[in-house]
Each structure stands twice: as C-alpha cells, then as structure tokens.
C-alpha cells in the first residue's frame, strides 16, 4: 500500500501545471482521500467534452445536473441524449500549501523550524524547513521538488 502523501506527489509530478484546474481522474483512485485531506478542492465541471464521431472525435457542450450527479450531451452520431456520471468531468484545484504542511508534520519538522518562504521555484521547488539531524544539535534543510 502506498502512502497518500507519495500518491499525491506522484500525481503532482505527472501534471504539466499546478495552478490550473485538473480533472479528477488525473489523481487516480485516491482522489477522494485527497479531497478529505483538503489537498484538492472542487473547482467546477467541464462545459464541453470530446465524444466519438465516426473515426474521430467532436467537441460537444454538456448539460450538468448537480442534483442528479450526472451530465448529458446530444450524441453527434445519432442525436440521442447520452447520460454519464458527473464525476467524469469534475475539476479540482490543488491546495499545495495544505499538502506541504501535512508532509512537514509527517516527517517531524517542528513548527518553529518550518520555512517562512516555502515556495522557492513556483510549481517546482519548495523549502519545508529545517529538520534536526538525529543525535546532534544540528539541522539540515528539507526541500521537495518535482520534475520540469
């Protein structure tokens, strides 16, 4: 079983940007856990989707029914209404600060040793703080980074 912190980091590492809304499926099967931990928050739904059309795809507008937890669109192939679960077009925003705070607590960085300037390179490098080196009075900086 993978740690939720590691699963979230892997999901972040596969995203092109962290400052844009993201489809729920990009977070994998753990996305509900990420919502509960407030690492991601709902940010609405897509208004258009790509659907099969002959040997290609076509963009169509969707009608969202939040109360019924579904969306629908008119199929360009046969004109019938297609109904799908709303989760398929749910968008989320990333709350990177919440995840970084939880990660700092997990690895045991004391509150007074947490960084006041966390973001070093936007969307790529963060300074969590200073971690005590075991058995000494020395501290080492702790950074987390993701690929370009």
Predicted regions and their residues:
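Extended, compositionally biased accessory segments flanking or bridging domains
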Residues: 1-137
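Extended, non-transmembrane interaction/recognition domains
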Residues: 133-148
């Amino acid at each position: 079983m993978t740690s939720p912190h590691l699963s979230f980091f892997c999901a972040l590492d596969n995203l092109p940007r962290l400052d844009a809304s993201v489809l729920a499926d990009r977070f994998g099967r753990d996305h509900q856990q990420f919502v509960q931990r407030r690492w991601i928050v709902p940010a609405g739904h897509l208004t258009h989707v790509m659907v099969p059309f002959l040997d290609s795809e076509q963009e169509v507008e969707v009608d969202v029914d939040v109360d019924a937890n579904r969306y629908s669109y008119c199929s360009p192939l046969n004109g019938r209404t297609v109904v799908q679960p709303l989760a398929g077009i749910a968008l989320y925003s990333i709350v990177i600060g919440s995840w970084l705070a939880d990660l700092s607590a997990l690895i045991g960085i004391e509150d007074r040793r947490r960084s006041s300037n966390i973001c070093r390179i936007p969307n790529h490098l963060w300074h969590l703080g200073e971690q005590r080196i075991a058995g000494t009075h020395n501290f080492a900086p702790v950074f987390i980074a993701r690929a370009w």
